[in-house]
C-alpha cells in the first residue's frame, strides 16, 4: 500500500513539473536571443593602435595602415601605397594627420612616414623604390594630432643634429632630469612630396617648424597629450607662457635652450599651478576646458583660448581643498566610478556634451553641464548627479542611447575599452561646447552651431583576454547597435 502511494505522489509531481514548464512564459528570453545582433567578422584583425579622419577617409592602424571612405559602408582596406612600409618587422604604432591632406605613420626605431590622402602630391607613376622617412624623424617614438600633427623625440637622442629645434642632448647621464622634445610638423614638410600643402624641407633653417622642450622631473614622467597652448604628461599639465623669461630651465646639456636657431625655435611651457592626483592617465580638451583623468577622478580646468596671448596657465579654484564636497572645488572635479580607467574622450551632438571614460569593462559617461564659469574663471561643468556609472542611467541623447543599452552590455560593455574615437561626419558637426538640459534631437547650439547636425560616429578600440573580440568596434546609427568593424 505504501509503495502504491509513493508511486502516485511521484506521478503527480512529474505532472506538475511538466505543467509548470509548459505554462512558463519564455517569450522574453527567446525574443532577446532572436533580436541579438550578429557579430561581424572584423575587417581589421587584432589590436587597434590609432584612428584618424583625413579628408573624406578614415585611417586606422593595427601595425599596418588601413583606410576606408568616411561616409561609405565598405570594409577597411590595407593602404598599398609605397609611401608607408608594409614589412612585417616595421609596425606602425601611431598615426596622426593635418585633417585633410596627409597622414603620418610612426614606426618606432625607424622614423615617421607620410601618406598623402587621395594621392595628392604623388608622382605620376604613384610608386617609388621604397618608402622614406621624414627629415629628422629617425628617433621619433610616436606621432599625434588630428589637425596640427607632431612627433615625439625622447631626451638624449640628439646625435644627428637638432634639425632647427634648438638645444638638444637632454637627459645626459650627468643629470637626473631630462626633456621631452615635441616636433611640430608644418604643412608640406619632409621627403615624400608636399601633398599639395606647399612648404617643404622639414627641419631646415628656412622652415616654419619648431620644437617644444618640456623639462621633466625624472624619467618616470611620460608624455600623454598636447594641444593648442598646453602639454600633458603623466604628472603635470604644462601651459604656454608667451614670455621666454618665464620659461623653464634649459634642458640639461642642451646649450641654446631652443629658440635661437631654426624657424620659430622653442616655445616656453611651464607647469600649471593646478595639482592632480598622479599618475595622470589621459586628458582631452574641447577648446574651452582641460579634462584630466586619474584613477578615481576627472578634473576640469578652464583653458585660456585667447589667440593673441600665448595662453596663460590654466586657472584653478582659489584655495583648493582635497575634499570634493568643498564649495571651492564644486564642479571642478568628480569621482568617475569607472574601474581601471584607460582613456578619455568628448562626444558632442546637438547641444549635448559628454565625457566618455573607457575602462576594464566598457565605458562610463559624465554629462557635462552647460558652459558656465564660477569665481576665478573656474569651470562648473562636473556634477556628481551627472556621473552615469551604468548603462541604466543613460538617456536617449547619450552616445549609446538608452534603448541600445542592453545590446551594449552584451558586447562592448563586457570588454576593456582601451581607446574611444569620436569622428564627425563631413558636412556638419557641433564643434563648440554648448549646454542644453534636455538635449532635444534638433536643438541648436547656443554658440551659433547648425540646428540639425549629423550625429558623430563613435568607435572603440576593444581589448579582450582571449583576443576573440579584440579590435575596432563602432556604434552603428542605422541599426542602433554596437558591432565590429
From Swiss-Prot:
Superkingdom of origin: Bacteria
A single cellular component GO annotation: plasma membrane
Lipid moiety-binding region (N-palmitoyl cysteine): 24
Region (Disordered): 308-331
Subcellular location: Cell membrane
Membrane topology: Lipid-anchor
Signal sequence annotation: 1-23
Lipid-anchored residues (S-diacylglycerol cysteine): 24
Family listed: Belongs to the TP013X lipoprotein family.
Stretches with biased composition (Low complexity): 308-327
Keyword Acetylation found: no
Record's protein name: Uncharacterized lipoprotein TP_0136
Key words, A-Z: Cell membrane, Lipoprotein, Membrane, Palmitate, Signal
